[in-house]
Amino acid sequence: DAKDLGVDMFLLDDGWFANKYPRKDDRAGLGDWEPTRSKLPGGIPALTKAAEEAGVKFGLWIEPEMVNPKSELYEKHRNWVIELPNRETYYYRHQLVLDLSNPEVQDYVYGVVDRLMTENPNIVYFKWDCNSPITNIYSPYQKANQGNLYIEYVRGLYKVLDRIQAKYPKLEMMLC
């Protein structure tokens, strides 16, 4: 029994998401934040229920600032990616950074957490990962204002985190 061993939380880490391009390694799925039906037929609700029945809390890994080129999000919103035009793209861990200077991207990233929390109110913790530095420095949104990209990116991230904290003040998050 997990609780008898001193376990107080079950954290579902990387690999639980995406259906068109299911996450099986670091080459696909980032950006498509729905449970992989073939891996989790009961979705996240079945896991939160099992955790509750075991007397432990439930946490979830996400990396919402990133996207794999092999994802539905990238196919639909390539213009949301920080990427130099007319240059060969550099991939760090087969992923790219979403442009959080763009309010549409901020809404999307907030929506990832909001949807997961709405559908799974028993989530008490997010491990918010960020496994790539910003490379390919160019924002389609900033256009002529490229010199402010880093600053506007961080401001955008803070706006997202402020919105999450305002709606879910008891939700714990570790940003790493």
Predicted stretch roles:
Residues 11, 54-69, 154-176:
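Aromatic-lined carbohydrate-recognition surfaces of secreted/lumenal glycan-active proteins
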Residues 15, 131, 176:
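Short, loop-centered acidic/histidine patches that primarily coordinate divalent metals
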Residues 3, 40, 44, 51, ...:
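Active-site-proximal structural scaffolding
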